[in-house]
């Protein structure tokens, strides 16, 4: 069945305003009702693609928030990335944060590499989110890719680099176990 539900894709719709919407509104009344229904159905409410006001509306209502594919604004200013307060709020609510491999969300440099992915993971860990991290690659939504990470089979390259910084069991949590544990809500 459905495990995660995104309320919008970057712009406004009947539920919420997205990250690129200029009017700055949050969840609509209908959007709030949808989040309540997602709670009742034990489905993750995805904050990726929401603007900040919609994000905070979701955090207030949702029992199971997730940022399925978002990174750290502190490391790369992009409207789809999350600021420290948003990341901390997800961690506090025991939500998941799927680090995305979209190059423009990882670095302001011309080309992203595996070290950029690791940098975002390390930063989320520094905020207390080691048990909240997963991979939110978004390969189906991008044309440009991280050097040596263009398909899911290339996860090994990310895992090998992460193993230089973390125990293998922690890397396994990032890759798989954190998501599985969070699915048992």
Where are these regions (language model features)?
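Mid-to-C-terminal alpha-helical segments outside catalytic/metal-binding sites
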Residues: 150-185
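Extended, charged catalytic domains and RNA/DNA-binding interfaces, predominantly
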Residues: 2-100, 104-107, 118, 122-125, ...
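Short acidic/histidine-rich active-site segments
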Residues: 128-150
